[in-house]
Amino acid sequence: MMQRFSIYLFSLALTLGGYAARAAGDTKAAELLAQARTAIGGDTKLSKVQGLSCAGALQRAMGDRQIAGDVTIDLQLPDKFLRTDSISPMGDAALVVTEQGINGDKVLRNSKTLNAPPGMMIRMPPPPAPGSDAEMQLLRNSRAELARLSVALLLTAPAATPLEFTYGGEAESPDGKADVIDMKGPGSFVAKLFLDKSNHRPLMLTYRGVAPRMVIQTQRGDGPGRGQDARTPPPAAAPEQVDINMFLDDYRSVDGVMLPHHIARAIDGQPSEEWTFKTVKVNPAFKADTFAPK
């Protein structure tokens, strides 16, 4: 499972081998980005892309297990993004559906359980309280994820999250060479985009962030007896920042735009998840409530 990670983890040498001497940053970065945009369709076609909907299979590492499911990524520029996961974490008919994303200044987060057997309850962590520091941090994280996906897929920074691009040098591994673009944005947003020198398409995007977590509690039977409370476990310690690498491949043309149909992530060098898209739609007609808080 996750066999393709062997290819991508091998290419992590790009980030470890050091970079060649840097050129005049902004000008070189602009030239490379223009070259990359031409490689995936050109400015005329890319400027017309205001939305994407990508749906397919999800594989995720969960402890020492691998779980499978479905994933949908909906993106509407300049400020809307929704990721929907549908998985069976217990390996049975119980299906956990989670939604997370952003609509302007509103965090989108929802979860529900379908087909849970009688006497079983699957509990997901509740969303942060409105106006809390946790909600503000989640809002920043969601904006950052929208920006990363927008750049990785369309080489476009969303207007809601303006980014600065500078040349980061050339990286090399036994797999080949890549041009490196450093990205900086609002707050502490920092990332690196690696462009394959052979075809100029996005190959990898690296950043530091909080590892995605899924905490699921199960309860069978009648639950706590009369007079007892269903106790919530104490809050976990603040998560630490980790190195996250996003790999992109299996490019195919969709309405004249070359888009990756396979995306994988590694966290601190270990396989985390991969998306294998069966359908990718450009400028889909989203339902009115797609990005509505639930």
Language model features by range: what are they?
Residues 172-293:
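Gly/Pro-enriched, hydrophobic low-complexity segments
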Residues 1-9:
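Bacterial N-terminal signal peptides that target proteins for export
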Residues 31, 38-118, 164-172, 185:
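N-terminal mature ectodomain segment of secretory-pathway/periplasmic proteins
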Residues 26-30:
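Soluble non-cytosolic domains of exported or imported proteins
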Residues 8-17:
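Bacterial N-terminal signal peptides
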Residues 106-150:
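Acidic/charged, solvent-exposed loop-and-adjacent secondary-structure segments enriched in E/D, K/R, S/T
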Residues 19-24:
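Sec/Tat signal peptide C-region and signal peptidase I cleavage site
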Residues 141-182, 203:
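Short, conserved active-site entrance elements at the starts or edges of catalytic domains
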